[in-house]
Amino acid sequence: MKKQWIAGAFGLTAALAGLVSVPQSALAWPSFAAGYEEARESSGKIVCANCHLAVKPTEIEVPQSVLPGKVFDLKIHVPYDTKIQQVGADGSPAPMQIGAYIQLPEGFTVADEKEWSAEAKESIEKYGGVTPLYADKPERSNILIINQIDGSTVPGQEFIVPVKPPDPNAKDAKVNFGKYGVYVGANRGRGQVYSNGVASNTAQYNAPVAGTISAVQTGVTFTDKLQYGLGTEATDFEYTNGTRVTITDEKGKASIVNIPPGPKLLDTVKQGAQIKAGQPLTNDPNVGGYGQEERDIVLQDPQRVTWLVAFLAAAFICQLLLVLKKKQVEKVQEFEAQKQGL
């Protein structure tokens, strides 16, 4: 069943997955989700949605059933318009980045390289492979991430992950045969909110109060405290060539809105203009978005499959014998009818 979550409904104070990092070469990191004890909440929402506020499709492909130890390919398609560029950390256009969060059933692992299909090997050579989200917790090695990468380097905008199912018949097995869920979240572009709730330069900026725009300054330098993942310390980041809008309310109190480079001021935002609380000051520069999908996969018992095949074969033989017997009876009846001159 397809589930895509609109992050705004869940607030803006959670840690981000895939949000901007200071270096231009590190535009977004799904690894920020590691700050959560559970990156996939009980509601089914993956925490990446907390900071990627736009909804975009994510498509996954897995087989309906698999056998123990039989490697299969998990395919994750992250579609986007290749003509569009995202807003970089300095406000300039930058290549669209894509990344993914993958939660396999417990016991399912990434296959060894010698077991990869040719298609999976070619894909991994392009995007670099998966990384455990909780590197310090081997028991949670089924939760993986694909860190942000330039989407133009990923053929077909598709990640392929070779997965090996466990064998419940193994001596130390902790899993059973049955149905399990595979959960995937994928984003394209940077997030709109940092871990501490501060908006990034891919967010739309609104007026915090109603009043009169008393000043509009361009080319402004200012500093914001940005937190790059839950549990990390917020650090100062200096924006240059930003915009500062001052709004004075009816009591004469001034509110200042510092806008980093990236969002563009609307034509209506001019000195002396009247504005309402919540009214947009800028356009929405975000061209990316996040989506998540889940699929059921059945870990089949080979013995059960064998018995099923045997049962179907026996049923087929029985039906065949019945057909042959019926034809035999019909021939006997036809012969007796001819003998009696009927």
Curated annotation (Swiss-Prot):
Residues spanning the signal sequence: 1-28
Superkingdom as given in the UniProt entry: Bacteria
Residues annotated as binding heme: 48, 51-52
GO CC annotation, single: plasma membrane
Transmembrane portions of the chain: 305-325
Cofactor details (free text): Binds 1 heme group covalently.
Subcellular location, record wording: Cell inner membrane
Pfam families reported for this sequence: Apocytochr_F_C, Apocytochr_F_N
One biological process term in Gene Ontology: photosynthesis
Membrane topology value: Single-pass membrane protein
Cofactor: heme
MF terms in GO: electron transfer activity; heme binding; iron ion binding
Keywords on record: Cell inner membrane, Cell membrane, Electron transport, Heme, Iron, Membrane, Metal-binding, Photosynthesis, Signal, Transmembrane, Transmembrane helix, Transport
Primary site of residence: membrane
Quaternary assembly: The 4 large subunits of the cytochrome b6-f complex are cytochrome b6, subunit IV (17 kDa polypeptide, PetD), cytochrome f and the Rieske protein, while the 4 small subunits are PetG, PetL, PetM and PetN. The complex functions as a dimer.
PANTHER family in the cross-refs: PHOTOSYSTEM I ASSEMBLY PROTEIN YCF4, PTHR33288
Job of this protein: Component of the cytochrome b6-f complex, which mediates electron transfer between photosystem II (PSII) and photosystem I (PSI), cyclic electron flow around PSI, and state transitions.
Family, per entry: Belongs to the cytochrome f family.
Protein name from the UniProt record: Cytochrome f
Lineage: Bacteria, Bacillati, Cyanobacteriota, Cyanophyceae, Gloeobacterales
